Amino acid sequence: LSLVSYGGDPRIVATHSEIERGRGTLQVAQNRMRAEFELTDFLIDPVQRALLALHAPSILLRIEKLQWACSAAAESYLSVEARVTNRIHWITQFIAQHPMLMALIPLGLGSRIPLALMGAVAATQFTDGKVSRILARETMGAYAGFTGGRASSGDDARAGAQEMINRAGIFGVLGSKAPALAGVGATPMRAAPNSMAQLTSRLAQTHSLEKPTVVIERYSDGKRKLFMVYLPGMRSKNPFDIAEPFNVSASVHALADAEHSACLLAAKSALETAGVGKGDALVIAGYSQGGLVAAELAAEGRNNVVGVVTAGAPVGHVAIPEHIPVMSIEHANDVVPAFAGKLNPLAENWVTVGREVEVKAGQTALVSHEIAEYQKTAGLIDESSSVGVSRIRDQLLAKFEGLRLVETQTFEYAGGR
């Protein structure tokens, strides 16, 4: 088992587009310098041209080396998956610009079953999860362009999800309504999490509870407070399951219109009931759909979010403030994170880390999305010496230093359509 990561390292500040822009600028400089050695130029200012010609070979050599370095960096940027995605994106752009190709789909099918949903279902059946990720990301990003006859940016997951709602033919099902608080409870006292494995284990416990539950821990040293929130993933794949606020309908709404999704409303209700003030420090961990909710809560800016941990969540499209340390744990062959429609950003305080999960004979790629596999990955994260991984990990765990657990509350919810 080996980890692959990017982001979280302040020494790495260039994005792929910036690398390409730098390479283009070097090419312009190289062409400009070579153009300075026409015979007529020497007649105008022979001394200066001679001096330039003397130093030109070494300068051009340095430019060529820098171009080569940019090419190598761009070629190895992130992963092969990202490069393949770019190629598939070109294809989807072409189809979006030529909507008549949609006529190839059987009559009536396009208006009843959204392509994004078809792609999602198909992707989960692939044994090669990395192919599934590419399909999912590109389908969600381009779906709005397909159906609207406009070119898609490839990043428009929100529009893609909204089109799923608009065109699914089950409008009453893919609605949203605030879930009802069904009960408030407490769990036995426990110490603050001292590792990513321990934090992810508590997230797994939250997800495995019998009823849809948000768990909130309150820490204090007598002067300052910190709240730790655990958000479960999608618990029901049935959009008609109105008793479940963390179902597939809420997942689609969380992508398209997060503010009114049942799962986000449940999280906000729990925070309010727990007495979390706007100035109280808040660390949020979420699995799958819960990770998306965690990212959206951080992006809203209504609470003092000081840390975010997501596992198997589609969050690349969410604009989380740059000062918040974020750890996104994503398996290379897990299709779910790809439904963000874009890769997570390369940022100083956002690290994306994961591994490729072994898919055995008879299994689908969905095994890589299981919370148990993310628990194993969290254990590897604790052992990692990668600058980006260790830096963000230590920042997150440092939030609990000097604090003791005061109480743990559980908030059960029902409904939410």
Regions found by a protein language model. Name each.
Residues 1-97, 417:
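N-terminal secretion-targeting helices of virulence/extracellular proteins
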Residues 29, 36, 73, 87, ...:
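Generic marker of "main functional regions" within proteins
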Residues 48, 55, 101-280, 302-417:
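Alpha/beta hydrolase fold serine-hydrolase catalytic domain that processes acyl esters and thioesters
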